[in-house]
Amino acid sequence: VGGIIIYIGILLYFLVNNNFIQNTHYIIFVSFFFLVGLLDDLSNLSSSFRLITCFIFTFIFLIFNPEIRINEILIFEKNINLNSYLNYFSIILITTLSILLLQNAINMIDGMNGICAFFIIISILYLNFNYLYLEISFFILFLILTFTYFNLMNKTFLGNSGSYLLSSILSYKILFINSNELGLTSEK
């Protein structure tokens, strides 16, 4: 239930602020993962089906949104520009696998709703030092804190819909910041 409330809150945020159209890519990205998580909550999808479905969607999404991808990695305090060493599809594959890794890591702790929620809160606060999507990030923080309050009262739980939704929000934000630092995207 908590994931549904957070998802509806995010959609309402974009509708109220009249920037639904400008953020279509973001909404499609997080909506897909939310729906996979919701279907899993309702019908207990197999883990291989979820993994393959999310892999295919993410890979196709990244192909059609070339500005959103991992461009640099930090290895032993040295920034490595992947564009200098790898072709486009290799970078898309690495980005896809990174998103799925984060998604599954967060999904593994979704049974511990408080830990999952606070991990997302700390991550979003840390990432907001770049001031990208600042307003929506604080709104999402408000939604997560509200969820956490009701979770502590044993009134709601995050579920796979919530963990998939929050992991997609976090991965999109990380990728957007990475792309923006290289000047590949414009601030929204």
Task: Please place each PLM-identified region on the residue numbering.
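"…together with the soluble PPM/PP2C metallo-phosphatase catalytic core" -> "…together
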Residues: 1-188
